[in-house]
Structure formats: C-alpha cells, structure tokens
C-alpha cells in the first residue's frame, strides 16, 4: 500500500474516510462538500481549535483519480491519500485502510461520488460528544440526477430508548448503509472491519455486526450525506451479476440475520421486505441468466427455502419479486431459471420488425406480446394484465400504444419506444408522458435528429439501435452465377415515394447497352391497394409508370412477383435497388448484401450512415453506369462479399439482442 500522508501531532475530532475508484469524472461534488466543511460556522464553533481529517483511499484506479487526489492533498494539511497495491473490487479494503490510519475520535465513511452534509455531520458530532454514543445515524438526502431531492431513512426515536429499541427502529426504518458516525475506539475495541471477500452487502454485514455490539446509539433527524443517484443504472458499482454475487447476497443476509438473532431479533422481519425487494430487482435487471451455474442458483434458492416461513408473510412491492421469491422457496431449478429472467413486454400495432427477434430474446428474457389490432384499438384488460407483469416494456412505433403505456407505467418499470419514421408526421410524440419514457429508439442516425427536432425530446434519451437481419439465414448466391448480374429487383414499389419510376429508368438505360437486364418487382402491385385508386396523385404516378414501360418496350423485362420470401429468393437478383425519396433504413437492399449480392442506393437523406457509401449514387445515370461496370463477375463478388461482411458486423440479429439487452439493463 502506498500513501501520501503527513506526520501530524494534530488531534482530529473526525476522520472522513473516502474510498475511490475510477472517480476522476465524478468526484467534484464530493470534494466541494469536503472543502466547504472546514469553514462551516457551526462545525467551527463545535470543534474550536480541533478539526477533522480526510483520508482518501484509492482502490488502484486506472484513470487519473490518484493523480487528481494527490494534487489536492498537497494543498490541505488534513487531507491524506492512500492507495491499495492492486484493485480489490469493493470498498471494503479501502475502508479498512481508512480505519487503520484514522486518528479522529469519530469516523465517517463517505462514497467518492456523494457529498457530506455539514449541518447533519455537525449535529451528529455534537450528539456523539455529548452522550458518548458508539454510533450516531441520520437520514439521507437522495439527489435524483440533480433534478429532484428527497429525504429518506427518517425515523422516530426518543431520548430514553435502549440500544435494542434503537436497533429495532433503525432496522425497521432505514437501509443499513455504513455512512453513520462511528466512534473509532468502539470499532477498534471490537475489531470491527469490513469483509474484503464480500462485494455484495458488505456494508449491511458491517453495520449489523457493529450495532449488535453497541451499547449506546444516537440519531439526528438530519441527512449526514447526499446520495447522488445517477442515471443509467448508476445505483450499483457493478452492472452485471454472476453466480458469485448471488452467493454473496444470501451469505450476507444470513450473516445479518445471525447478528440480529443474538439479540432475539430477525432482520428479515424488520426490513426484509425492502432489502430483498431492492436486491432481487437488481438481480433481475443485472444477472445474465445464460451465464450462471446451477450450483450457484441452488445455493441462492436454499436461503429462501430455509426462511420461507418468514418470507411467506411478506408482500413485496414488486410483482415479479413476489413470484420469484415463491419459486426460489419451492426450489425447482428449471422454474427458477425462467422466473429469474427479466420480464419483457413487446407492445404495439404492427410488430413485424420486432417479432422475429423474440426467440433469441427469450434466451435472456421472459417475453410476452401485446399486439394491438390497429394503431388505436386494443383490449385494455389484456394490456393492463401484461403491464402489471412487465419489468421492461418495448413499444413499437411512436403511436397510441406508446402514449397509453407512458400514462400507466410504474416508476420501477423501464419503458422504451421505438420510432421508425412515419411517426414524425403524427402527433403522438406531443401527447406522450415524457417523464415516463426511459429511452426513444431510432433505427438510423439521421432519424435521431429528425425525432429531436420534431418533438424536442431530451437528446440524452434518444438512442440509435439499427434494424436487425438474420444475416446467416439467407439462401446464398452462387458466386459462379453470372446471370444474376443482369437481374435487378425492387422490394416494395408502392407508394410513389419508393421511386418505382426511377427503377424503370435505370432498367431502360441498362437495356440500351445490354438487353439481358430485367427488373423484378416484389410486393403488392398498386392495383391491389384500394387506397391508391382513391389518391389522384398516386394514381397518376403509377399510370405514368405503366406508360413508361409501354413506351420503352419493357413489358417483357418487368416481372411483378407479388409477395415473396426474400430469405429464399433475393439471392437470385444481383442488384436490389433503393430509389426512395426518403427512408428510415430500407431493409430490402440490405437483404441483398446478406444473400451475397448488392444493394444500390440513390442518396436519400442519411443513407450513407446506414449502408456503405460506395453503394450510394448521385442519380439514375450514375447507378446505371455502376451496374454496367459490375459485369465482371470477380469485381461483383468482391463488392458483394464486402457488403455481406458489413451487414454481419453491423446488423446481425445477435448484435440487436445485445444492444437491446444493454439498453434495458442500463436504462
């Protein structure tokens, strides 16, 4: 262990112990509060010539935390810096180092991203010094992302309460964090230390063991520190749990239960509803169910089976936690493996872009579907049932379903809404409860800017997750098949913004040089869509297309295939055309790449951020010339292979599942 401390004769009243790890970008609030503490009038009056020290213990940070603290400690005689010899992975060892080096009458543990409350600490010190308490606890101010503050962990006590009565009051009404004012002599006398082998619940174990040995406990009705709650799952130092965390959780709970049992108490009865509810919500969110051993799950479940008599009487606030505790108590491993997965609800009126991902999502999630028959119609009882069930809610399309869910989602649930493109012309984004939405998903980078500009959404909530492809599921083109180089396709020619006439113009230009070129039109013809007949502009456009075909003798060169299974057919067509005026991402040409062929694009806005720029052409003439230049099979296959790799590396379904998983677990 290295240190940067001074040998001082000063007798400190208070030692503030601050463990740090990779905190260089978030320690400002903590440092500011400590700098202000020394000049706080009430504290100065209380301490007189005596004062306090601050001990920073860096857990071998890999960023600039140590260097930043080293520079700051050189400015203050009462600030000292220590560093572990290697990263220990938890605050336990740094806190123990702080206990060993502290010289104050009292010790206070402060996390490096929180701030100390000068008023509360002064009151706690005054009470401790007056009544010689072993420890003094206070409330906590929670700062939600700098936008909202609330006071938690307030309890009612009286001056004549015994230590045991204080323990009951504290355990019933507070989370047992270690941020209390501790008498240093009390900690040393009872050899009270944090368990360095425990990363989950280490402060709970320490606090319960210490309170069990205390004979005098005080409380001040003021916050001792401000807990700076961060967005994006920032409540926990770890964002993914493994079997080790499961074992540590229940081991910690059992040790706490044993400590309370020494006084004839049960922590599970006093606070188990909140401790287990909170912890299991984190387990559900952060445990990767595909990466945990059966033995770890069995060890975890055994705790719930052992205490099922107590747990049976507890009604947890989270519905999923209730069901999970019941299954853990029963101990059936197969059922536990399923119930411990997060519950994902997919909702919306047209789920064709999301449903194919469900089988893969089910490896990590329980998945249910609330599919609305139309954009506005749904069975409300069905939606309410699955809303009550869900942990995470994915609403497809920024339409009526997104508004409905935003008005009803619980604060503990995570709601995300995916916008494709056409929603920009609707007003649902103006109606949505913005505070209830954790993230808005767009399918292309340019759609992010469109969404923010149209609805003025918070930029921090707008994310880009591209559409997915089952890149390995397409029938692959025969690399020796030269005929496919003369076969064009357009997937979806209606409405007119899809640019069908421009596709015909490309075909006509190609046939001027080589009559082998043909065009296949996949999807419904305009003649099959009644709404086209009722739209004069659309009707006139497709009449012009028919006239162009006849005028340029293309009748035998254009095939209307109707609906086709693109997984099985797109390999036959060397070029799939994207002629649109505007798109979100345009899936069809991407399918061509997946099958070992090529997608070619006119420059609709944002296309260069979705597909390779080398496949984007300024106009019809440039696109036609490129296709002619690709009549060399070797050149064609080289570009096709590059496009195939691009699709796999950027848009494969496995990447989409990982992106969704990361979004929900960190939203």
Label the predicted regions.
Residues 107:
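Short aromatic/hydrophobic "clamp" motif used to bind/position activated sugar donors
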Residues 33, 58-68, 86-88:
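A conserved acidic beta->alpha catalytic loop
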Residues 114-220, 225-246, 250, 256, ...:
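Donor-binding/catalytic cores of nucleotide-activated saccharide
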Residues 12, 480-498, 504-511, 519-520:
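Conserved donor-binding/catalytic core segment of Leloir-type glycosyltransferases
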Residues 77-80, 533-562:
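Nucleotide-activated donor-binding/catalytic signature segment of Leloir-type glycosyltransferases, i.e.
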Residues 288-340:
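Membrane-interface aromatic/basic loop that binds lipid-linked glycans or pyrophosphate carriers
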Residues 84-102:
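Glycine-rich, basic loop-to-helix element that forms the pyrophosphate-binding segment
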């Amino acid at each position: 262990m290295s240190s940067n401390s001074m040998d001082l004769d000063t007798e400190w009243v208070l030692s503030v112990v601050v463990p740090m790890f990779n905190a260089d970008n978030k320690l400002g609030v903590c440092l500011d509060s400590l700098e202000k503490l020394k000049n706080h009038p009430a504290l100065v009056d209380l301490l007189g010539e005596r004062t306090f020290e601050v001990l920073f213990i860096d857990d071998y940070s890999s960023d600039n935390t140590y260097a930043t603290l080293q520079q700051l400690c050189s400015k203050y005689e009462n600030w000292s810096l220590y560093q572990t010899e290697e990263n220990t992975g938890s605050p336990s060892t740094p806190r123990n180092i702080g206990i060993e080096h502290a010289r104050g009458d009292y010790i206070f543990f402060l996390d490096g991203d929180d701030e100390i409350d000068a008023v509360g600490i002064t009151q706690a010190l005054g009470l401790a010094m007056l009544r010689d308490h072993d420890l003094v606890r206070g409330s906590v101010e929670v700062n939600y992302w700098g936008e909202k503050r609330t006071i938690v962990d307030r309890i009612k006590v009286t001056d004549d309460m015994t230590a045991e009565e204080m323990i009951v009051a504290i355990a019933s009404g507070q989370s047992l964090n270690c941020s209390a004012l501790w008498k240093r002599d009390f900690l040393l006398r009872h050899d009270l230390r944090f368990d360095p082998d425990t990363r989950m619940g280490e402060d709970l174990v320490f606090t319960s063991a210490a309170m069990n040995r205390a004979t005098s406990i005080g409380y001040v009705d003021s916050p001792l520190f401000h807990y700076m709650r961060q967005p994006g799952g920032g409540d926990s130092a770890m964002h993914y749990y493994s079997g080790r965390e499961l074992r540590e959780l229940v081991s910690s709970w059992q040790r706490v239960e044993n400590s309370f049992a020494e006084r004839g108490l049960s922590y599970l009865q006093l606070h188990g509803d909140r401790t287990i509810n909170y912890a299991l919500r984190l387990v559900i969110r952060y445990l990767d169910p595909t990466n945990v051993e059966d033995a770890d799950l069995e060890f975890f479940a055994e705790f719930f089976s052992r205490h099922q008599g107590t747990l049976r009487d507890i009604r947890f606030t989270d519905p999923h936690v209730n069901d999970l505790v019941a299954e853990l108590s029963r101990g059936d491993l197969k059922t536990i493996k399923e119930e411990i997965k997060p519950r994902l609800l997919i909702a919306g009126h047209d789920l064709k872009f999301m449903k194919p991902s469900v089988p893969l999502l089910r490896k990590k999630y329980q998945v249910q579907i609330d599919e609305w028959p139309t954009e506005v119609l749904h069975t409300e009882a069905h939606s309410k049932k699955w809303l009550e069930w869900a942990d995470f809610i994915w609403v497809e399309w920024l339409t009526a379903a997104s508004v409905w869910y935003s008005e009803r989602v619980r604060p503990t649930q995570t709601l995300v809404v995916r916008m494709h493109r056409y929603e920009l012309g609707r007003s649902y984004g103006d109606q949505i409860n913005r505070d209830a939405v954790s993230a808005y998903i767009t399918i292309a980078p340019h759609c992010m800017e469109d969404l923010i500009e149209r609805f003025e959404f918070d930029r921090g909530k707008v994310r880009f997750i591209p559409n997915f492809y089952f890149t390995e599921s397409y029938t692959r083109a025969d690399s020796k098949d030269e005929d496919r180089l003369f076969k064009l396709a357009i997937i979806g020619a209606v409405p007119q913004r899809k640019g069908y006439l421009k596709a015909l113009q490309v075909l006509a230009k190609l046939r001027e040089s080589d009559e082998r070129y043909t065009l296949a039109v996949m999807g419904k013809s305009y003649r099959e869509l009644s709404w086209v007949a009722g739209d004069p502009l659309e009707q006139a456009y497709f009449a012009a297309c028919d006239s162009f075909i006849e005028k340029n003798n293309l009748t035998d060169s254009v095939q209307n295939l109707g609906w086709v299974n693109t997984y099985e057919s797109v390999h036959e067509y060397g070029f799939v055309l994207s002629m649109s005026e505007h798109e979100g991402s345009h899936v069809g040409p991407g399918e061509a790449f997946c099958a070992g062929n090529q997608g070619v694009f006119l420059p609709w806005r944002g296309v260069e951020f979705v597909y390779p720029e080398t496949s984007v052409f300024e106009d019809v003439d440039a696109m036609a010339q490129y296709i002619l230049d690709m009549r060399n099979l070797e050149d064609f296959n080289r570009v096709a292979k590059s496009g195939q790799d691009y699709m796999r590396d950027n848009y494969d379904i496995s990447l989409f599942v990982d992106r969704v998983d990361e979004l929900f677990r960190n939203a």
